[in-house]
Swiss-Prot record:
Gene3D superfamilies: Nucleic acid-binding proteins (2.40.50.140). Residues 107-138 are annotated as: Disordered. PROSITE patterns: SSB. Homotetramer. It comes from the Bacteria. GO terms for biological process: DNA recombination; DNA repair; DNA replication. One of its GO terms (cellular component) is nucleoid. The keyword DNA-binding applies. Plays an important role in DNA replication, recombination and repair. Binds to ssDNA and to an array of partner proteins to recruit them to their sites of action during DNA metabolism. This is Single-stranded DNA-binding protein 4. SUPFAM superfamilies: Nucleic acid-binding proteins. The keyword Plastid does not apply. It comes from Streptococcus agalactiae serotype V (strain ATCC BAA-611 / 2603 V/R). Pfam families: SSB.
């Protein structure tokens, strides 16, 4: 059997990072994934997909991403169930992500000014050098 999922979408909220009693990282997040077609009004609808990630990748996801970022994930679909406080059995279908990739640059506008100060001066005003090629072996 094959159970592979590949999604590209935007985070609808910041990743929620928790730890199990045995100190295993668990990240939950929601991806908004645009559909490939437009509705009758000409708008593109989106699906909002619940996802979970575990261990080191979960910590990396929480540390490096934020709401609104475009990311890609790979993983599998998984169904689980639990009993709520009213005693009802609740079934949940979610994507268990194995890996992620950030698909856009991080917003570093706050660091941009300090980076510009550290860049070397432009060479746009310099003159070309006259170098003789008589000594070249080819």
């Amino acid at each position: 059997m094959i159970n592979n999922v590949v999604l590209i979408g935007r985070l609808t909220r910041d990743v929620e990072l928790r730890y199990t009693p045995s100190n295993i990282a668990n990240a939950t997040f929601n991806l908004a994934v645009n559909r490939n077609f437009k509705n009758a009004a000409g708008d593109r609808e989106a699906d909002f997909i619940n996802c979970v990630m575990w261990r080191q990748q979960a910590e990396n996801l929480a540390n490096w991403t934020k709401k609104g970022m475009l990311i890609g994930i790979t993983g599998r679909i998984q169904t689980r169930s639990y009993e709520n406080q009213q005693g009802q059995r609740i079934y949940v279908t979610e994507v268990v992500a194995d890996s992620f990739q950030i698909l856009e640059k991080r917003d570093n506008s706050t660091n941009q000014a300090s980076m510009d100060d550290q860049l070397p001066p432009s060479f746009g005003n310099s003159q070309p050098m006259d170098i003789s090629d008589d000594d070249l072996p080819f």
